From Swiss-Prot:
<keyword id="KW-0997">Cell inner membrane</keyword>
<feature type="transmembrane region" description="Helical">
    <location>
        <begin position="172"/>
        <end position="192"/>
    </location>
</feature>
<dbReference type="GO" id="GO:0005886">
    <property type="term" value="C:plasma membrane"/>
</dbReference>
<keyword id="KW-0482">Metalloprotease</keyword>
<feature type="transmembrane region" description="Helical">
    <location>
        <begin position="145"/>
        <end position="165"/>
    </location>
</feature>
<feature type="binding site">
    <location>
        <position position="130"/>
    </location>
    <ligand>
        <name>Zn(2+)</name>
    </ligand>
</feature>
<keyword id="KW-0472">Membrane</keyword>
<dbReference type="InterPro" id="IPR001915">
    <property type="entry name" value="Peptidase_M48"/>
</dbReference>
<dbReference type="GO" id="GO:0006508">
    <property type="term" value="P:proteolysis"/>
</dbReference>
<keyword id="KW-1133">Transmembrane helix</keyword>
<dbReference type="GO" id="GO:0004222">
    <property type="term" value="F:metalloendopeptidase activity"/>
</dbReference>
<feature type="active site">
    <location>
        <position position="131"/>
    </location>
</feature>
<dbReference type="InterPro" id="IPR050083">
    <property type="entry name" value="HtpX_protease"/>
</dbReference>
<dbReference type="InterPro" id="IPR022919">
    <property type="entry name" value="Pept_M48_protease_HtpX"/>
</dbReference>
<feature type="binding site">
    <location>
        <position position="134"/>
    </location>
    <ligand>
        <name>Zn(2+)</name>
    </ligand>
</feature>
<feature type="transmembrane region" description="Helical">
    <location>
        <begin position="29"/>
        <end position="46"/>
    </location>
</feature>
<keyword id="KW-1003">Cell membrane</keyword>
Length: 313
C-alpha cells in the first residue's frame, strides 16, 4: 500500500511540474518539464538522501566519535528489527532530527547538536525511535523525494517570472499564467508536503513509542523541541524550506508566518496522543512535561550524568 501511495504522489508531483511548464511555455514547456521531472524522479531515488544531508551540512559519526548517541540508535534499531542506519550529526543550535534514505538498508538518521545537548538520553531515544519508525514504515523515500521535487517546483515557479514573459514561448495564458505559476505552484507543493507529513507523523509517533517502550520519552522531547524551535532559527532549513517536512518538529517555526502552512500536526495534539498511549503502558509523566524549562542536558551536555538513567544511558 505504501508503494502505491508513493507512486500516486510522484505522479501528482510530476503532473504539477508539467502544469507549471505548460503555464510558462505552453505544450513545449510541458514536454520539457516532463523530461526534467522524469530525470529528477530517477535522480532523486538514488541521490535525494545525500542531497538533503548535504543541504544541512550533516557529518557522519560512529561509535568512536559519538558513542552514546550511536549506541542509542544501534539499540533501537535492534529492537525494531532494522539494519543499522548511518548516523549523522548536524551542527545546529535548534534541537531537531530527521531520517532519510530510499529503504531500510540505505537509511540514515540525523540529529542536531542542539538536540543532543538539550535532551536527556531517554528523550533522545524517543526521538530516534520516531525516526526509525519512519524508516520502518518506508516513509523516508517518499518524504525525501517530495522534498526534492517540491524545491524544484518552487524554483520553476520563480523561473516563470524571468523566462515566461517572452512572446515567443507559446504560453497560452500570457502574464496571467506566469502569475499563477509563481503563486500556485509553491503553494500546491506545500499542500502536498503537509498532507504527507501530518498523517505520517502520528503513525511514526505511535510506532516510535512502541519501539522504545516509553511514549512519554517522545512526548517530553516534543515539548522541549517545540519550545526551542520557536526561539532558535534553523538557518539551513530557512534556506531549504522544502525539507521542513522531514524534521520531527517544523524547523521553520522560528519565523512568524511559517505556522500558517505548517507541514506538521499540532504538537500539543501529538503529545496528548502519546500521553493517552502512556496510559495504556502505565507510565507517569516526566518532569519536563510539567515544566517550562528544559531538564537535564543530553548525551553531549554537561549534566547528562545527572539525568534519569534508562536502558540506553
Amino acid at each position: 500500500m505504501n508503494m502505491i501511495r508513493t507512486a500516486m504522489l510522484l505522479a501528482f508531483m510530476t503532473a504539477l511540474f508539467m502544469a507549471v511548464g505548460y503555464l510558462i511555455g505552453g505544450s513545449g514547456g510541458m514536454m520539457i518539464a516532463l523530461v526534467i521531472a522524469a530525470a529528477m524522479n530517477l535522480f532523486s531515488y538514488w541521490n535525494a538522501d545525500k542531497m538533503v544531508l548535504r543541504m544541512h551540512h550533516a557529518v557522519e559519526v560512529d561509535e568512536r566519535s559519538a558513542p552514546e548517541y550511536y549506541r542509542i540508535v544501534s539499540d533501537l534499531a535492534q529492537r525494531a528489527g532494522l539494519p543499522m542506519p548511518r548516523v549523522y550529526v548536524i551542527d545546529n543550535p535548534q534541537p531537531n532530527a530527521f531520517a532519510t534514505g530510499r529503504n531500510p538498508q540505505n537509511a540514515a538518521v540525523a540529529a542536531t547538536t542542539g538536540l543532543l545537548h538539550s535532551l536527556t538520553p531517554e528523550e533522545v531515544a524517543g526521538v530516534m525511535a520516531h525516526e526509525l519508525a519512519h524508516v520502518q514504515n518506508r516513509d523516508t523515500l517518499t518524504m525525501t523525494i517530495t522534498a526534492t521535487l517540491a524545491g524544484a517546483i518552487s524554483m520553476l515557479g520563480n523561473f516563470a517570472f524571468f523566462f515566461g514573459g517572452n512572446r515567443d514561448n507559446n504560453n497560452p495564458f500570457g502574464f496571467i499564467g506566469i502569475l499563477v505559476a509563481m503563486i500556485v505552484a509553491p503553494l500546491a507543493a506545500m499542500v502536498v508536503q503537509m498532507a504527507i507529513s501530518r498523517t505520517r507523523e502520528y503513525a511514526a509517533d505511535r510506532r516510535g513509542a512502541e519501539i522504545c517502550g516509553q511514549p512519554l520519552w517522545l512526548a517530553s522531547a516534543l515539548a522541549k523541541i517545540s519550545r526551542a524551535a520557536h526561539r532558535v532559527v534553523n538557518v539551513d532549513a530557512e534556506r531549504n524550506p522544502a525539507t521542513a517536512h522531514l524534521f520531527i518538529i517544523n524547523p521553520l517555526s522560528g519565523q512568524r508566518m511559517d505556522n500558517l502552512f505548517s507541514t506538521h500536526p499540532n504538537t500539543e495534539n501529538r503529545i496528548a496522543a502519546l500521553q493517552a498511549m502512556a496510559g495504556e503502558f502505565g507510565n507517569a509523566p516526566p518532569a519536563s512535561l510539567r515544566e517550562d524549562e528544559p531538564g537535564a542536558d543530553g548525551p553531549w551536555g554537561r549534566s547528562a550524568s545527572r539525568a534519569r538513567k534508562g536502558p540506553w544511558s
